[in-house]
Amino acid sequence: MIAEPTLAQAAHAWGAQGIPFNDEPKNDLFRTASIERATTLLNQSVALRSVMLLSGENGVGKSALAGRWLRSLEPKVYFPVCITQASLTGIGLLALFLQKLGKAPKHQRSASLKLLEEAFGELGRLIPVLLLDEAQNYAMSALEEVRMLLGLNLPEQPAFALILVGDSYLLSTLRLRSHRALYSRIAAHARIEGLSRSELEPTSNTSCARWESNVPALNRLRSNF
């Protein structure tokens, strides 16, 4: 959550240059071992147009990592699409995917699929990357729709890269028989872990370094944190 304007104003009044432990997009994440591994697998997955699962407990930074990584993709190589509305049905997800690709969805699924193929064709050499956040909350119809869309280009390479972001329950859900077809397509799985004891201090120092202040008392408070 980005800091409230009143909090930012108060920090400025005290001479602080920033607020520690906020999630402004311009702030880099602390590169833990699990984040480094996840980033490597994310880059490999999109390059190969494969399916990847990014999981972890609530609050470990999955969405923060996914968002920053998605925005960092080279626009001359990739066309990123992020969908966060986990309440969508299969038809709704297809419609939103089309809209984000610049197409107006049709009432008939067959017509929408034809538009989707046209959109992929218009992208040329750009690789579409679809990221579904909070994927554990998607209805079975939505996940099944995504699985079928992956096969649009068969027997050629997949039509797009798919990144599923979710909590620890997502992997268990995908292992169920109803989702076995999608589960079998997962080429990589990265789990974001919470900070280890050895990572806590450098993480705190990195964040607090943004809280430089002209007020000596505040700097002493930071040093004692």
Positions of predicted regions on the chain:
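Walker A/P-loop nucleotide-binding motif
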Residues: 48-68
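Residues at the beta-strand->loop junction immediately N-terminal to the Walker
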Residues: 55, 84, 132
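AAA+/P-loop NTPase substrate/partner-engagement loops
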Residues: 75-100
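Short regulatory helix/loop adjacent to the ATP-binding pocket of P-loop NTPases
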Residues: 70-72, 170-185
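Mid-core helix/loop region of P-loop NTP-binding domains shared across ATPases and GTPases
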Residues: 2-12, 16-20, 88-96, 104-145, ...
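A short, basic N-terminal segment
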Residues: 1-48
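Walker A/P-loop
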Residues: 63-79
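Conserved AAA+ ATPase "SRH/arginine-finger" region at the nucleotide-binding site
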Residues: 83-86, 174, 187-199
